[in-house]
């Protein structure tokens, strides 16, 4: 798992192909928690990439950050 940037609000990483974006076993949020070594870390999906697609993903580290980032994606 390659993390490009992280702070207390967001985390930017490379999603490999073959991995789902959603929070389910083996999905990106779970992989980030595993990478951080914190099974209870708040990691929320802001946008999705198809499972077959590799690319950069932005994930939120709090509910408030997720809401703000989701608004920006919709705009």
Predicted region positions:
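RNA pseudouridine synthases
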Residues: 1-75
């Amino acid at each position: 798992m390659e993390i490009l940037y992280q702070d207390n609000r967001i985390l930017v990483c490379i999603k490999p192909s073959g991995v789902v974006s959603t929070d389910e076993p083996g999905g990106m949020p779970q992989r980030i928690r595993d990478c951080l070594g914190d099974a209870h870390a708040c990691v929320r999906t802001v946008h999705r990439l198809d499972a077959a697609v590799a690319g950069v993903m932005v994930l939120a580290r709090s509910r408030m950050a997720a809401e703000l980032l989701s608004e920006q994606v919709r705009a």
